[in-house]
Swiss-Prot record:
Keywords: DNA-binding, Isopeptide bond, Metal-binding, Nucleus, Phosphoprotein, Repeat, Transcription, Transcription regulation, Ubl conjugation, Zinc, Zinc-finger. Coiled coil: none annotated. This is Zinc finger protein with KRAB and SCAN domains 5. Residues 218-291 form the KRAB domain. Belongs to the krueppel C2H2-type zinc-finger protein family. One of its GO terms (biological process) is regulation of transcription by RNA polymerase II. The keyword Magnesium does not apply. PROSITE patterns: KRAB (PS50805), SCAN_BOX (PS50804), ZINC_FINGER_C2H2_1 (PS00028), ZINC_FINGER_C2H2_2 (PS50157). May be involved in transcriptional regulation. The keyword Mitochondrion does not apply.
Amino acid sequence: MIMTESREVIDLDPPAETSQEQEDLFIVKVEEEDCTWMQEYNPPTFETFYQRFRHFQYHEASGPREALSQLRVLCCEWLRPELHTKEQILELLVLEQFLTILPEEFQPWVREHHPESGEEAVAVIENIQRELEERRQQIVACPDVLPRKMAPPGAVQESCSPQPLTVDTQPEQAPQKPRLLEENALPVLQVPSLPLKDSQELTASLLSTGSQKLVKIEEVADVAVSFILEEWGHLDQSQKSLYRDDRKENYGSITSMGYESRDNMELIVKQISDDSESRWVAPEHTERSVPQDPDFAEVSDLKGMVQRWQVNPTVGKSRQNPSQKRDLDAITDISPKQSTHGERGHRCSDCGKFFLQASNFIQHRRIHTGEKPFKCGECGKSYNQRVHLTQHQRVHTGEKPYKCQVCGKAFRVSSHLVQHHSVHSGERPYGCNECGKNFGRHSHLIEHLKRHFREKSQRCSDKRSKNTKLSVKKKISEYSEADMELSGKTQRNVSQVQDFGEGCEFQGKLDRKQGIPMKEILGQPSSKRMNYSEVPYVHKKSSTGERPHKCNECGKSFIQSAHLIQHQRIHTGEKPFRCEECGKSYNQRVHLTQHQRVHTGEKPYTCPLCGKAFRVRSHLVQHQSVHSGERPFKCNECGKGFGRRSHLAGHLRLHSREKSHQCRECGEIFFQYVSLIEHQVLHMGQKNEKNGICEEAYSWNLTVIEDKKIELQEQPYQCDICGKAFGYSSDLIQHYRTHTAEKPYQCDICRENVGQCSHTKQHQKIYSSTKSHQCHECGRGFTLKSHLNQHQRIHTGEKPFQCKECGMNFSWSCSLFKHLRSHERTDPINTLSVEGSLL
């Protein structure tokens, strides 16, 4: 990028006055020389090869063929096809175009860092923007103080830019307001010498404040930072740091001359420079602007902000709104003692949290002050951060920009999409080390850990006296930030609260107003980016079991207000969540989500063993107990285990002799609801007998019983052949086998095929020696209860199967089928209808 060029003498005054005012002018003269020593000092880089290729001129070659050849060589030096792949070369071309379209104030700064990819360039720009935001908060006015020496020592070098450095001067002949010029006069920046090759030096003449030329205030920043990018790369880290600090001083001095923000907010901080011998008073009626110069790469960010500043005619206290004043006081009221390890930052006086950026500190302060400056124009709801307001406004607009690529479901917040991904993957990365239970969300794990915390704290308080202080020995295993890749299946294992111990000591007394921080429960992670220290405090109710939210209707209490709101919908009958497909409403959103899967056919929960899918996670959990044989719900009375909680609840009624289901016909009470339905079928048969119709077949008609049970449930699964509907897909699958005559289950003993798994178990009882069902009349035993029922008809003379053609009765259905064949020739259609009704 550094080429041999002829440098012209840079003169700041017209040529006619050069001989007379050599002592008064700011002159920089560099003779023509070969800059190969700079290449030795700074070896060619990727940016150097790129600049050689871009700035190659046609006249540098002897002819068109040589020019084309040199361009090819320069392009190969830049793109390096022998080392880079096609994708890498494309990335370099995209990077070159990206750097070209950047704003002028960003281009030199980004090229200084020599990014090798577009991502690196974007990262540099984001860092610049963050630094701009931080400096915008920190730039303040130093009242009436301007340092005499504003240039960093040993920082200015020779400028390789072909553009001359111009400094506007006021000719001595101009009579306009000489007094004002003297008031606006500033000492010209001292340019220290830097040793060059062959003992050449960069000389600079300084202007005096009396009869010599005066420099405008607006150009102080340009003169102070007249560095070119190549020169900046020659400085070491200490010189760069010194230059940055002094650049801030220069800019603070410019603002002290009367420049204020557009909002007329007066920013006050301590003086930057100790040199307070010379003071200048800001002009009373002056309006100036700082000119732009794209060559000043290092301070292009500050110059952009200087242009947005205006001179305030009345230098004094500016009007501020309360929120600006609070934010300003929070920034300025920071002492050096509040920094840690010499770092520059801001520490919160309320909670002690430390922030490096002022913008983050201001947002944090709003948590303590309760300020919510961002208000929704639709509903008037306020938020303390703009991003929260943006998310809330999507509720009114219906915008859902985050879409799942698997099922197409859209979300308003990106975190909701991340949580939704775990539904498809079935992943539960948050595990409890106490009981081994896994959770798909971190909030669910926290709620689960609170239960362990309450149990152990209650156990501890029972053993100790009331005067004993309660404490928790916290221990948490470190988990790294690398374990937190969402796209790579999050693998976080949050450690559990461990070792509560017999004796408990609490580090601070708990009163009703004081809470237990979450870091007392979970500890602190090792990663700075995963900062859970801002998790809200957990109220004392987490450890005492307090339920402050009480229902006025039934008196039931809840820990969280959201649970109370959901519970109150039971009393009010409110069902705000409605299905757009069928119009059915629900009182909870999760119920609506589960119902909508009936229409969409979505089954996101898949069993990894057999591949069976389910709409609800709880159904998958119940199904997995089939493979594992686990029966987690055990009866404390007899020790019997059950796979479902509802089965255990029905079993417990046997011990408590609780009979909650009563028949309205005869008043008989039953333990289970299915027993009540079976009993009501008997009453139906008795009523039909009074009408002269024998309906004894209804005494054990499972079809009627199932129809009774499904009356209160949905029946979304319908058979395409006969139109019959079912509440569960498994019932529909079994029903299809009646049409297809499929028998997938086989007996292991005789290899006979059956249509249902339950029929297989009944069939295998034939080969067993045990006959548990015994007739009380003759003592004969049977393996199946249905066989016993058929046998008992011999003793009772019961004939429940009747032919509708001739009225003849039979004890068994097989006898009726044989009889019906005699009517086939006369009326085969009626015979088929009778067979269908019996089936």
